[in-house]
Regions:
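Positively charged n-region of N-terminal signal peptides that target proteins for export
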Residues: 1-8
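Bacterial N-terminal signal peptides
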Residues: 9-20
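N-terminal "domain-start" segment that seeds a small globular fold
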Residues: 24-48
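Active-site acidic short loop of glycosyltransferases
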Residues: 52-54, 119-121
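Hydrophobic beta-strand anchors of alpha/beta hydrolase catalytic cores
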Residues: 57-58, 88, 157
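Conserved redox-active cysteine motifs that mediate thiol-disulfide chemistry
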Residues: 60-77
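Thiol/disulfide oxidoreductase modules built on the thioredoxin-like
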Residues: 119, 127-182
Length: 185
């Protein structure tokens, strides 16, 4: 097997592992985020402007992310129990633009993945060309993106309050991540 091909998954795993407990809370310096629109896997359009007054939770993932397999079902169950399921978006933004992957996620891979972890397609969005990722990154939602390039750590959860301001960014979730999300909702 080509050793070069083995480097990328190892590098990705190490970045995720080493930075998995990094948390940035922006509660004091709330960044205003721009509005956005994105389609879910069922074809329905989500427009953030129609959700003003309600918090939004965005969870960025990719299909080969081991921590995502644990975080996503737990977050889905938590948001369901809180009655906030309509404000939860799982966003796959693992695209060629990151330049660390030869084989980006596809809609088919995402559907297989979410079937495996039992997440309904209405909650899952495919940021195929990285538009939402870029908007959020340029707005400061991913502090590590400036430090290490365009890479966003996975899973990454951001919470936007009802005024459209960023109140929490968890890059690489870890133990107690649900408590941190609940605290700012």
């Amino acid at each position: 097997m080509n050793k070069t091909l083995l480097k990328y998954p190892i590098i990705i795993f190490l970045l995720i592992f080493l930075l998995s407990l990094n948390e940035v809370s922006l509660a004091q310096d709330q960044t205003q985020l721009p509005s956005f629109r994105i389609r879910n896997l069922s074809g329905e359009l989500f427009d953030s402007r129609k959700h003003l007054g309600k918090p939004l939770v965005l969870s960025f993932f990719f299909t080969r992310c081991p921590p995502c397999r644990k975080e996503m079902p737990a977050l889905h169950q938590f948001m369901s129990q809180e009655g906030l399921l309509e404000e939860l978006l799982f966003v796959d933004s693992y695209v060629k633009a990151l330049k660390i992957v030869d084989e980006p996620d596809t809609e088919r891979k995402i559907k297989n993945f979410i079937n495996l972890i039992k997440i309904p397609p209405e909650r899952v969005y495919f940021d195929e060309i990285g538009t939402l990722l870029k908007i959020m990154s340029q707005s400061g939602a991913f502090p590590n993106a400036k430090r290490i390039g365009t890479l966003v750590l996975y899973p990454t959860i951001i919470v936007i309050n009802g005024s459209g301001k960023l109140v929490l960014s968890l890059e690489g979730t870890g133990p107690g991540f649900l408590d941190k999300v609940k605290k700012v909702l």
